Amino acid sequence: MQYMLDRRSASVYGLVLLTVVGLLGATQAISNLLLVPVVLAVVVYEFQKRLDQGVPLLQLTSLIAVLQWLVGPVLAYNNDYEYGKYQMYVDETTYFEYALPATTLYVAVMLAIGASIRQKELLSSLDKSNFVKIGLFLNVIGLIALFAAARFSGSVQFLFLLISQARYIGAIYFLFSRHQLRFVFAGASMSLLLLGAVNVGMFHDMLLWMALLFCYWFAQRKWTFKAKVLSLGLTGLFLFGLQVIKQDYRAQIRRGESPSLVAMMVGYLSPTGKAWDDGALANAIVRLNQGWIISAVMNHVPAEEPYADGGTLKEAVESALLPRFLAPDKKTAGGRENFIRFTGLMLEQGTSMGISPLGEAYANFGSFGGIFLMMGFGAFFGLLFKWSLRLLVKRPAFFFWLPLVFYQSIKAETEFVVVLNQLSKGLIVAIALYYFTELNFPVRTKKYILKTVAPVRRISPGRANA
């Protein structure tokens, strides 16, 4: 059964290239305009290579990190746009001599230690006859949990919100059910998420879950290289269009209007549309760039705020592993407190921003220690994902539940406390719901019986004549 797993999540050449670029970045001997595109090219190549093999979760995590920690910042440093509060707070050399090695080594270690799954082979033996029932069952549970979450706060609310995401796992079951209405059912499972995003103009969760569902669906068959490049190109164009309209779209919603998302995107992306104006391009770079927050941390720590020396990591582990009654003062998930503390910048009431693992690593140990912490984080994530994939060999249907465990880990802006909370509590919820579902609607593994044919007995000519 081990043929279903690839021991590494990237080619040896890709891993070596990432490491070399990271070391060159630490010296800043070569322009970042050359180094960052190389890193992006390697990660995009590894992502597309496994896109039709199985959900490339580690590669997707790497791609998002590279885009937000390296590509966004290099664009921000190399143009004349005005960014105001969202400016880079340290010079380019200072930022990239930390961010380039920390990011590339984080990605390289994670992909080297992690594994990739061969989805088609893994799921080929599953009996899919109960998949529609499971999808409906998970939607009912998810909706009940969603309404229950509105009545609670704190840890209990977080638990119900986790359970409410069972609807999206139900959508994956629908996609693999082979039912003639499977796409309609999957769309219905995602409908509240889509409507919520469109109504308030907050698209992050919607985009991430849609990307995960697309990866599951895409890997059901092999695609040509051209088809994969076309898919990535169209996705990139869609994301760019969404970023450039987002500000105006939200402004219209605040005025009580009902803007059309599709119409605005088409208008902005036309040859004479607003998407190509300096202001819109600057806004798109700001949306992509997580580096402005990281640079603010580097500017503020240790000049105004001393290094945390692992303090936030201890709080994250405590928050993830200890129940509230054992640690009543444990840290709650959310980035507002760390953002204000480590950047020195203020946030409006009700606004929360994370400083990202890269920013938090620097806030704890500075450049040198932060690089090693990011390597350790990559190793931890890669090992945990590999361990999860090995469990799938015996329980293939749990493959559909992986997003519930690793959802927050994919993001590039979430802090360690959020990541560890999702990993620990998401794993518990995923296992509990998986077994509860299996108890009611078991997914059996088909058993293939090889027919044996009796050997043909050869009769000598003498005996035949007799």
Predicted segments, located by residue:
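Hydrophobic, membrane-inserted alpha-helices
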Residues: 14-22, 39-43, 141-146, 166-173, ...
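Central hydrophobic cores of alpha-helical transmembrane segments
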Residues: 58-67, 185-195, 209-212, 228-236, ...
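Membrane-interfacial loop-to-transmembrane alpha-helix junctions, especially the N-terminal start
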Residues: 4-14, 53-66, 126-137, 179-187, ...
